[in-house]
UniProtKB/Swiss-Prot annotation:
Taxonomy of the source species: Eukaryota, Fungi, Dikarya, Ascomycota, Pezizomycotina
Spans through the membrane: 53-73
Disulphide bridges: none
Biological source species: Diaporthe leptostromiformis
Its biological purpose: Tyrosinase-like protein; part of the gene cluster that mediates the biosynthesis of the phomopsins, a group of hexapeptide mycotoxins which infects lupins and causes lupinosis disease in livestock. Within the pathway, phomQ1 functions as a halogenase, converting. The pathway starts with the processing of the precursor phomA by several endopeptidases including kexin proteases as well as the cluster-specific S41 family peptidase phomP1 and the oligopeptidase phomG to produce 10 identical copies of the hexapeptide Tyr-Val-Ile-Pro-Ile-Asp.
Protein known as: Tyrosinase-like protein phomQ1
Major site of localization recorded for this protein: membrane
Disruption phenotype: Abolishes the formation of phomopsin A and leads to the accumulation of phomopsin B, a dehalogenated derivative of phomopsin A.
Cofactor descriptive note: Binds 2 copper ions per subunit.
Length: 389
């Protein structure tokens, strides 16, 4: 440690050692000697003052830098975003894919349904994604992380298709605004080039208004996990059952069907995209267009075990696309903008829920390493590298 006292003592000791043969007492007491010492000490004192000034300025500067970093890290933007990729993959709408590309995707999904689970014996890798979605439900729904969490979830699912099943293309999406006049007639339900259609109208109800799907590539497929209930309960139980759907049609409830069609119409989605900030956008989106699809399909799709239905991933890819479009309207202000409760405020009703932050770590339910929200805000930065056509 630097010591002013030891520095001055060393300087004087050297001077006295050089006074051999001289009356030291008289010399040290003389005005000439005193003046000489003061003059010789002046540069050293100036140096000391300069060092003190440098130290003080450095401390203040460092404190200011730390203060700015803390402020920015708790805000909605970041000054050092990850480097963007130069050749992003392009996610395309389902009906724009060639029949060959559609078949490759369906085949990869079927592959996941035959690979063994890493969590529970007797279930599949596909089932693990259903369980993980439910396990993290209170963090990934009606919360600030709703959109970022599902973006990461889709990335992990897409990576599983590639790593385990040889899929080489991008995850497709279903733009349901194109079918808002007649959801049940969408080509997504085609038994040959799609995912099969409604549940068997003459069959027994399996769960939540749904019946076994009996056509298409997933006809009579067995799913391992079922939700304990609709609504706020995120829990699932092991309960093998057939993939189930129960479309709302005119004969069921014409008024409800018209309302659901309206929620996914181009004009209604345009209103959502016009929302000025993140919390207004995600709240309007989640409770409006996003929820309309599960309420139309019903069955597995109506609960937190919704990923039992392979169409779920195309639905949420479209949700991600619309968020991406909203971000692209003002990248500087929106790419890293997040706001809302840290957890599902419905599930924690009556309890104080903290504000979500871009620094929050999102639990991924064992599907991947837990990750900070800020890592998935930009689809062309970091490990993400995609955009939408």
């Amino acid at each position: 440690m630097f010591s002013l006292r030891s520095w001055r003592y060393t300087a004087l000791a050297g001077d006295e050692d050089d006074l051999e043969g001289i009356d030291k007492k008289a010399f040290l007491a003389s005005p000439l000697r005193s003046s000489s010492l003061r003059q010789r000490n002046q540069p050293k004192q100036l140096l000391l003052l300069l060092l003190r000034t440098i130290i003080v300025v450095s401390v203040i500067t460092f404190a200011a830098i730390i203060g700015c970093w803390v402020f920015l890290s708790h805000g909605t933007t970041t000054t050092n975003p990850p480097q963007q990729c130069s050749t992003p993959a392009v996610r395309k709408e389902w009906r724009s894919l060639s029949p060959s590309a559609q078949a490759k995707y369906i085949s990869a999904v079927q592959c996941l349904m035959y690979l063994p689970s890493v969590h529970k014996e007797g279930t599949t890798l596909y089932d693990d994604f259903v369980f993980g979605h439910s396990k993290t439900g209170s963090y990934s729904h009606y919360a600030a992380s709703f959109l970022p969490w599902h973006r990461m979830y889709l990335h992990v699912y897409e990576r599983a298709l590639r790593d385990h099943c040889g899929y080489s293309e991008s995850l497709p999406y279903w733009d349901w605004t194109l079918d808002s006049h007649h959801l049940s007639a969408s080509p997504i339900w085609d038994p040959v080039t799609g995912f099969g259609g409604d549940g068997n109208p003459g069959g027994a109800e399996t769960l939540h208004g749904g019946r076994c799907v009996v056509d298409g590539p997933f006809a009579n497929s067995t799913r391992a996990w079922r939700a304990l209930s609709e609504g706020h309960n995120h829990d699932v139980e092991y309960g093998p059952h057939c993939l189930s759907r129960g479309f709302i049609i005119n004969n069921d409830d014409r008024t409800t069907l018209e309302m659901l069609h309206g929620l996914v119409s181009p004009s209604r989605v345009a209103q959502t995209l016009d929302k000025p900030d993140y919390i207004a956008f995600f709240e309007d989106f989640e409770s409006g267009p996003h929820n309309a699809i599960p309420q139309f399909i019903r069955g597995d799709f109506l609960t937190f075990s919704a990923p039992n239905d392979p169409v779920f991933y195309l639905h949420h890819a479209n949700v991600d696309r619309l968020w991406w479009l909203w971000q692209q309207r003002d990248p500087a202000g929106r790419l890293y903008q997040v706001r809302g409760p840290a957890k599902d405020f419905r599930y924690h009703e009556g309890h104080e829920v903290s504000e979500g932050s871009i620094e929050d770590v999102m639990p991924m339910g064992g599907l991947a390493e837990d990750i900070k929200m800020k890592s998935v805000m930009d689809t062309r930065a970091g490990f993400l590298c995609y955009e939408y056509e």
